[in-house]
Amino acid sequence: MDIINNNHRDENDDDEEEALSAMSSVPPPRKIHSYSHQLRATGQKGHHRQRQHSLDDIPKITEIVSGCGISGDSSDDEFYPYATTTNSSSFPFTGGDTGDSDDYLHQPEIGEDFQPLPEFVGSGGGVGMFKVPTRSPLHSARPPCLELRPHPLKETQVGRFLRNIACTETQLWAGQESGVRFWNFDDAFEPGCGLSGRVQRGDEDAAPFQESASTSPTTCLMVDNGNRLVWSGHKDGKIRSWKMDYVLDDGDDSPFKEGLAWQAHKGPVNSVIMSSYGDLWSCSEGGVIKIWTWESMEKSLSLRLEEKHMAALLVERSGIDLRAQVTVNGTCNISSSEVKCLLADNVRSKVWAAQLQTFSLWDGRTKELLKVFNSEGQTENRVDMPLGQDQPAAEDEMKAKIASTSKKEKPHGFLQRSRNAIMGAADAVRRVATRGGGAYEDAKRTEAMVLAGDGMIWTGCTNGLLIQWDGNGNRLQDFRHHQCAVLCFCTFGERIYIGYVSGHIQIIDLEGNLIAGWVAHNNAVIKMAAADGYIFSLATHGGIRGWPVISPGPLDGIIRSELAEKERTYAQTDSVRILTGSWNVGQGKASHDALMSWLGSVASDVGILVVGLQEVEMGAGFLAMSAAKESVGGNEGSTIGQYWIDTIGKTLDEKAVFERMGSRQLAGLLISLWVRKNLRTHVGDIDVAAVPCGFGRAIGNKGGVGLRIRVFDRIMCFINCHLAAHLEAVNRRNADFDHIYKTMSFTRSSNAHNAPAAGVSTGSHTTKSANNANVNTEETKQDLAEADMVVFFGDFNYRLFGISYDEARDFVSQRSFDWLREKDQLRAEMKAGRVFQGMREAIITFPPTYKFERHRPGLGGYDSGEKKRIPAWCDRVIFRDTRTSPESECSLDCPVVASIMLYDACMDVTESDHKPVRCKFHVKIEHVDRSVRRQEFGRIIKTNEKVRALLNDLRYVPETIVSSNSIVLQNQDTFVLRITNKCVKENAVFRILCEGQSTVREDEDTLELHPLGSFGFPRWLEVMPAAGTIKPDSSVEVSVHHEEFHTLEEFVDGIPQNWWCEDTRDKEAILVVNVQGGCSTETVCHRVHVRHCFSAKNLRIDSNPSNSKSQSLKKNEGDSNSKSSKKSDGDSNSKSSKKSDGDSNSKSSKKSDGDSNSKSSKKSDGDSNSKSSKKSDGDSNSKSSKKSDGDSNSKSSKKSDGDSCSKSQKKSDGDTNSKSQKKGDGDSSSKSHKKNDGDSSSKSHKKNDGDSSSKSHKKSDGDSSSKSHKKSEGDSSSKSHKKNDGDSSSSYKSQSGKKNSNSSTVEESRNNHNKR
């Protein structure tokens, strides 16, 4: 047809003539006389009787219908039904070809076979917005995905919409409006339960899942892997916990129940996170942020089920309100606006809180407010201002200007003064809007935050802006790769995934460069989570899809080709009959008989019925009121419109047979849709739209109203139009259609949940706004262009041209409709490709439907008044499906193929000046069984060798080493843990967690670890940075620091008072360093034991503010435990130490600076507890130490660097255990050792680098323990200590995975050396 040769009007005429010739070989008899003069005569009644045509002359549909198909009557043999040249006639429909026995698929009145009506195709299709959407078994523009939960019909989700998702290692949890649910990844590829299953509607094709008992709507989720819990925040202000490892008994379908639950906030809980120390943070309205420490929750979680109420009460009372803490004298440093989301910066142990225009940065350990800043990165000094505080000032300013102007001379005229006043007022209002935010500020509102793999923080705004921040809240750079609002983030390795309100997902790298992007859903992406090698995305409609982390890439092509080969296993064909009816009612009302004649008589076999009415109401006041309501979003319709819907519903036996799905009214335009109840499970997602075209595109006397539905997972749009009137207004009608087609945007109907109810922000997110003029064409493709089937019907007002009133009536009386069609404006415009481009209409075989005199039956009722309007086919039905050529057959590539069974007008209805028109379609629909395709997807993932090879590549983890696996800390020690990436090609991503902590008891051999929330760190331990990336062949240094969390007032007789009893004992924590590649699914773990040695027995509180633990301390830096040490660098514990810098605990100390505990202290700076202390810096616990740096445990050591434990050692590097060793490198234990670099244990040690424990140690650098220690830097414990700076103890200070040996035999030294 004309789709192929749409520029050749002559060929189109030939095609139609050829089709018409198929009806009969004998042309219809032409009458040789004309009735034109008789029509003009009004005085002779005989002529009227001769020209009086009634409906008896036109066969009714019941007379046309026969048992084997549609056939014509001899009185109208010019228009036999025939085989059209379109594909719609290429297949005769039989009721059994679909395998479905529903009643609506059969038509006992018409029979199983039918002959489609011939069609006329307009030119101009196939290009631009009139191009048929591309369809295929798999979407060609996005990667193949795991459809964990296929798109459910939103009518099935009322009260059950999914709002958010979160992933554990083995499960995906989803929060919904009635509780929570979870999927096990082991069951991800299992088939759904189907329509006859035990699940509710909407989840028939979803993978098997478990659902909780009903709760208040879930607003946020957070996973606590440390305690195998999932925490959820709810709309009622409660926080609930759920066990991950909940196992149901076989056959037990009872919903699982919550664990701990308490009232956290008065309003909804917007976000819940765990800090680096296991504390639970939550936020709500009014700028409220609360904290529940892990200690309080742990106690409540340990209580029995019958003590559930007591547990909730304990937690609820233990909450810390941060807003109250930062409020001084009624002034608060943070804004009172709603806190939208929280982010745990586990790299630096901080917490971010995002509000509308500001951020607040908190210390996760001390819970102190660190900084408040806005989206531009500027520090906010005064945030909590009452709403509208600036507005009165601006108003006063405006009034002052006006008043001052009135008091002065008025040199200008009245108009000029009025103009100045108006401009001044506008300027003041503009400034108020700027201060208050306005549309510009609203566009920059923060919607989501995420912590990237390299430790940077990213935020997304409503205008699509992506902002990168460092850990201190400094704005680094910003990007914009998409014009729509950012709703969510997700990170995996070195990739950042972004979800937009438009349904797009984009991937960027850590530098902000765009890697890939695709349309993931046809609704907004409101949440994403990563697990099991997939990035799972949740759309507004509740569908969940899993995208392989390797996508886009070679994997996509393999899976796509494999699934395409199995197309017939998951493709299903169904069919449905759709009846559309259009009637311009002219502000009248219809009788029951008229509605039965129009709709009821032909609705017995249809599954979907769509009715469009025009001119329901047309009063000027009503039109103005309707326009005002539309401007503020009111679309509830009018009383008369509701009357029509109810009346038609009664005609269709609405309660028993049909179900009303939706409606939309725009002034005088009304559209409504009904679905047969046995088809109801396959039809839904009703959306509505309206486009006014009258009086400057503002009034609804002309325009269009539309309904969009999903039928067997295919989109269909029905648009009821009333275009511009008058014979000469052809161009205006074309422009009206073009405007409707381009601007019609569907939204949820009034009886469905709005977008914010499903988690979408209420900001301005439209993709067709004028503010988004820069959006590319692909992103703003028209809703109608994306539909699989589009049906336009209504009063199009196209007239007959080039023909007189009398001639038109003459042709009508002769039933020469072929001559009249040549004069049809709409057909001419469609041929020229100026309107309804590429769309089709059945060839008209009924008389013109306009204009008639009311209540005058028959063709004699045409307008005979003064104007004598020429009869015309104003009321039409035009459509398109997914066919791109006449030869296209129904398949997944061409999923909707429609043919017309009936197209006529009800000429016996006389209640209006228009006759109602109806068109019945038979639509074949090819769709996908999502459950079966998910099984095929899983089979390919598990069995295809190429796919397995690509997935195995994702398991590669760069080789990394950790410098130590054992650390000992005491008295604010700091140990540097070095993580090295030995791979020379790929980056390594690491994260450090705490597997648990335990109290060390002498009577126990094994430690019982107690994990904190989300594997948080104990409060005495500070690890920084706890996450980040390591470049190839590089290393990163991690500071592991012991931190005391006490003040002097908490000490009584040297014993801390506010700790638990076990806190006075030694503690041990196990750090886990998780390492993965930039895009790897596997993780390598390194475990590091960290022990905290508590020495409370030696603690005393002195009046001196310093906290030194040495008697004599001089410039000691490090941790020394030696009697004599010189220039030792490490951890020394000596009786005599000079110039030691560290932590000393000696009897004599001079110039101590830090934390010293000695009997003598002079000029000490810090907290000292010593008798004599001079210039000591640190916490020393040595008797004599000089310039010792490190941790030495030797009696005499010089220039030792490392961990030595020898009596005499020189230049030894290694691990020696001999009495005399020179230039050894390692860990030596000899009596004589000089220049030892390693771990030595000798009585005499010179230039020892390591951890030495010798009686004579000079210039030792490391961890030395000697009686004489000079220039030691570390932690010394000696009786004489000068210039001590560091942290020293007399027993055991800082070790890194090694134990000091104190043996003096040569054999043991050689054995240790050989081991090195």
Curated annotation (Swiss-Prot):
Biased composition (Polar residues): 761-772, 1101-1113
Name of the protein in its database record: Type I inositol polyphosphate 5-phosphatase 12
Enzyme Commission number(s): 3.1.3.56
TM stretches of this protein: none
Family classification: Belongs to the inositol polyphosphate 5-phosphatase family.
A Gene Ontology molecular function term of the record: metal ion binding
Tissues in which the protein is found: Mostly expressed in leaves and flowers and only weakly expressed in roots, stem and young seedlings. More precisely detected in cotyledon tips, hydathodes of leaves and mature pollen grains.
Phylogenetic classification of the source organism: Eukaryota, Viridiplantae, Streptophyta, Embryophyta, Tracheophyta
Covalent S-S links between cysteines: none
Cofactor dependency: Mg(2+)
